[in-house]
Amino acid sequence: MASILTSRDVKVINFLEDSNIVLNAAQIGKIFYSEQARDDKSSLKIAQKRLKKMIDLKYVKRFRSYSNQQYYYFIGSKVPKLTEHKLLISEFITRMAEDNFELESVKLEWTHFQKDYHLRPDAFISFKYLSHNFYILLECDSSKKFTNEDKYYKLFTDRKNSLEIQEVLPLKRVLIVSLCDVKTETSKITPVWIKNDFSNFSQLKYQFVK
């Protein structure tokens, strides 16, 4: 595999397989091939070329969205259903990569705390920034506002005295991000609010420089 594919190709394959996420060629270019490219157009061309190789070797599959006629790439036995939530998550992590956040892993519909806290964030994102490990609990609410204030408040309150929770969600290393068009107004917790059109995406990086 390594003799035929590049190390970047292997990262693409592993990422798609581990996350069950779908990405288009432009997004894959920005996340995985931007260091080799001059600009977004160049990274897209590189990604398209490498993805063709991965498809020819049957490591990756693709399907076309009838709504926008784009190809989306995935690994799995069934063609995944394209939902607004999944598209928002794919674009969110792409924006992260563009802002020099180093993606480590993405877990969709993360259920680690579902039993005890009735929480299932749309994505649990592990990443590095300035060589430090961080985590995002991502809540996508395309048609409503953030609604899990009390549940997250209990989880983060319990975390203060629970080493078990801290092993999963280290202190001062976790952000709750509310991806929706309605600004979150809470008194107990403070999610980072990102609009669905990503026009205020700079708010994420601001959390690391303020």
Question: Positions of the model-derived regions?
Answer:
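Short, amphipathic alpha-helical interaction segments positioned at domain boundaries
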Residues: 75-100
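Active-site metal-binding core of divalent-cation-utilizing nuclease and nuclease-like domains
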Residues: 81, 98-134, 144
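Nuclease-adjacent, charged terminal/linker segments that flank catalytic cores
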Residues: 1-79
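Charged, structured surface patches that assemble and position nucleic-acid processing machinery
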Residues: 188-210
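Catalytic cores of nucleic-acid endonucleases
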Residues: 140-191
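Hydrophobic, Leu/Ile/Phe/Ala-enriched alpha-helical segments that form helix-helix packing faces
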Residues: 16, 32, 51-58, 92-100, ...
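Conserved catalytic cores of phosphodiester-cleaving nucleases, focusing on short active-site segments
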Residues: 92, 119-160
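Alpha-helix termini
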Residues: 35-39, 100, 127-130, 158-169
